């Protein structure tokens, strides 16, 4: 052991055993991963922990994500009622369980706690926290673009000579966040003495760059070990303690309050992307916020919406903004705009469904949601039928003005993916474990299927089904591909020879189904066979994958999108990868084909839109 390491270890041991230093500190309680649902054990133990905290002396209490299990309005209201009893200033960040499975499309948690980020000052300390994602679909954590801008501008404002910064996020400053390097690069420019996260329900000391970080406990650490974290910040040290309810604090980590860091250089966002041979690649748009939607098209424009509730029409040829409007509730939008008839565009959003004029964005109609948000991708069929999934319902609306024609409202959770339609069959999944087929004519139920599992998160809630003449084929997070008789709804076969999830598509002639697996493979399956018949598998070299991005075939090329900004093109005839193209670091929202030009368009969560054209 070097002398430097020995000295550092001795100083750490001394810091952890000097109670006098801790008593002089700014002191915070951190609750992380409390996972409260009404009446569960965590509900009871959180109440006990809050009562214990109220007997102490703290400067603030920070709740660092995963307040609930499913982010429902009921669960958020319940945990808020418990947290309101805390007598100290309270600051709350959502976690992936509030962002990913949300009854309100993340709106309720923001409204309840006044936002999804915070900053406050305590003497010479600036404490700052931002949201982690992932947002309303399976994905890696992601810091929204507007939150990165806010973080820098906020630290510019608050950090004056003599100030130190303590950072909070539910996710670690590691590869769990697709854009953690951009996040870290900002923090490294300021006197950040530490970063504190949860998520893994475990203790861990680690470095991000040269910033010291701590992964801290959950409310429930098993074996009846319920508790929270105490953080003390003194002029020279930050101390982190494990506090089991009813027991004395136990020292875990101590950080030397280092305030100068090595700058982290990032690649320029203007980096030129080299197009694969035989293709052109153009960046159509770069947004100042994050984009969670797929894309809609008409003759001139591409349409999408962002995390600030801005809906935009951009000329797809020259990349110029045609118009931009805010949805009425200004909440993040997760559904793609749907181009309708007579210069009309439907914009599903958290609180309703807006119909706007495609030429200027002028609001024509605004239909308020009966219950819950619209997060599903709607569809306009070639025959002119507009179908839109919602919360606990799916609707057919008039394509001229969005007026409701019928609704099927016997769902138990929200729709998310676009439905599949052929003839009178409308097939769609919902996050209630079920796949349903209803009549296009009147919305009456024809059949319902589920995989027999009770967990909503294992059902076909975010997959676009494939319809053949006699089958419905799906994949789901239970890691099966399933074929169902299209007429009766009876299960024909199931296969788990690959780790399927939610990414599915089909060949142009409907004879093959393509699935992207969790191992980064593209699997081709015979859609005409009465039994499961694998045709071929290509390793796309993506490694671990979970992005629900659909697979699409155009002009003899199969396109798949990844969780880390890569679009891969596969030649189905040669059964080989043509090319893989990195367009960014974040998830590809979808592979969308422009019906006018046949070009492939993709949007990335980081806010960019690209066009890929075959020459």
Predicted regions and their residues:
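Short coil/turn segments that connect the beta-strands within blades of beta-propeller domains
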Residues: 299-300, 342-343, 382-384, 423-425, ...
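His/acidic metal-ligating clusters that form di-metal
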Residues: 53-60, 139-212
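Metal-dependent catalytic neighborhoods of phosphoester/phosphodiester hydrolases
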Residues: 41, 65-84, 99-111, 176-182, ...
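Extracytoplasmic beta-rich repeat domains
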Residues: 275-296, 324-339, 366-380, 406-422, ...
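N-terminal active-site segment of His-dependent metallophosphoesterases
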Residues: 22-78
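Short loop/turn segments that connect beta-strands within beta-propeller blades
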Residues: 315-319, 357-361, 398-402, 439-443, ...
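Binuclear metal-dependent phosphoesterase catalytic core
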Residues: 204, 209-273
């Amino acid at each position: 052991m070097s002398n430097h390491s020995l000295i550092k270890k001795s100083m750490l041991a001394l810091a952890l055993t000097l109670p006098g230093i801790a008593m002089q500190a700014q002191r915070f309680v951190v609750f992380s991963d409390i996972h409260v649902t009404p009446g569960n054990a965590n509900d009871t133990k959180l109440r006990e922990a809050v009562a214990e905290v109220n007997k102490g002396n703290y400067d603030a209490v920070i709740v660092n994500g995963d307040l609930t299990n499913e982010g429902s309005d009921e669960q958020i209201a319940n945990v808020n009622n418990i947290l309101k009893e805390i007598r100290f200033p309270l600051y709350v960040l959502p976690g992936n369980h509030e962002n990913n499975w949300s009854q309100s499309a993340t709106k309720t948690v923001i409204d309840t706690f006044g936002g999804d980020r915070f900053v406050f000052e305590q003497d010479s300390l600036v404490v700052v926290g931002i949201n982690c994602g992932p947002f309303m679909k399976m994905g890696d954590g992601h810091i929204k673009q507007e939150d990165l801008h806010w973080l820098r501008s906020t630290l510019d404002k608050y950090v004056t000579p003599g100030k130190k910064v303590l950072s909070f996020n539910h996710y670690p400053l590691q590869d769990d966040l697709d854009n953690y390097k951009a996040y870290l690069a900002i923090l490294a420019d300021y006197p950040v003495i530490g970063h504190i996260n949860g998520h893994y329900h475990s203790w861990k000391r680690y470095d991000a760059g040269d910033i010291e970080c701590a992964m801290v406990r959950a409310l429930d650490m098993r074996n009846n070990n319920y508790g929270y974290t105490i953080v003390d910040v003194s002029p020279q040290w930050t101390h982190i303690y494990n506090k089991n309810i009813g027991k004395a604090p136990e020292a875990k980590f101590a950080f030397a309050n280092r305030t100068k860091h090595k700058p982290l250089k990032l690649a320029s966002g203007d980096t030129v992307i080299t197009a694969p041979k035989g293709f052109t690649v153009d960046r159509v748009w770069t947004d100042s916020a994050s984009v969670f939607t797929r894309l809609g098209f008409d003759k001139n424009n591409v349409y999408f919406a962002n995390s600030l509730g801005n809906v935009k029409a951009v000329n797809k040829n020259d990349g110029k903004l045609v118009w931009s409007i805010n949805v009425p509730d200004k909440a993040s939008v997760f559904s793609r705009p749907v181009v309708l008839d007579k210069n009309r565009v439907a914009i599903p959003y958290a609180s309703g469904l807006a119909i706007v004029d495609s030429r200027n964005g002028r609001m024509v109609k605004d239909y308020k949601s009966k219950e819950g948000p619209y997060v599903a991708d709607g569809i306009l069929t070639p025959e002119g039928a507009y179908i839109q999934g919602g919360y606990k319902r799916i609707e057919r609306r008039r394509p001229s003005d969005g007026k409701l024609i019928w609704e099927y409202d016997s769902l138990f959770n929200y729709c998310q993916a676009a439905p599949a339609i052929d003839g009178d069959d409308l097939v769609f999944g919902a996050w209630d474990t079920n796949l349903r087929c209803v009549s296009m004519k009147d919305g009456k139920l024809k059949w319902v299927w589920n995989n027999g599992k009770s967990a909503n998160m294992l059902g076909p809630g975010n997959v676009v089904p494939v319809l053949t003449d006699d089958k419905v084929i799906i994949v789901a997070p239970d890691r099966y591909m399933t074929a169902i008789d299209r007429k009766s709804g009876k299960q024909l076969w199931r296969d788990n020879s690959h780790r399927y999830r939610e990414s599915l598509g089909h060949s142009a002639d409907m004879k093959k189904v393509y699935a992207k697996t969790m191992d980064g493979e593209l699997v081709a399956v015979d859609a005409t066979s009465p039994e499961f018949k694998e045709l071929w598998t290509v390793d796309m070299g993506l490694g671990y994958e979970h992005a629900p991005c659909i697979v699409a075939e155009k002009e003899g090329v199969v396109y798949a999108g990844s969780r880390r900004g890569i679009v891969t093109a596969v030649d189905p005839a040669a059964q080989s990868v043509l090319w893989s193209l990195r367009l960014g670091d974040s998830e590809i929202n979808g592979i969308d084909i422009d019906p006018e030009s046949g070009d492939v368009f993709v949007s990335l969560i980081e806010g960019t839109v690209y066009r890929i054209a075959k020459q």
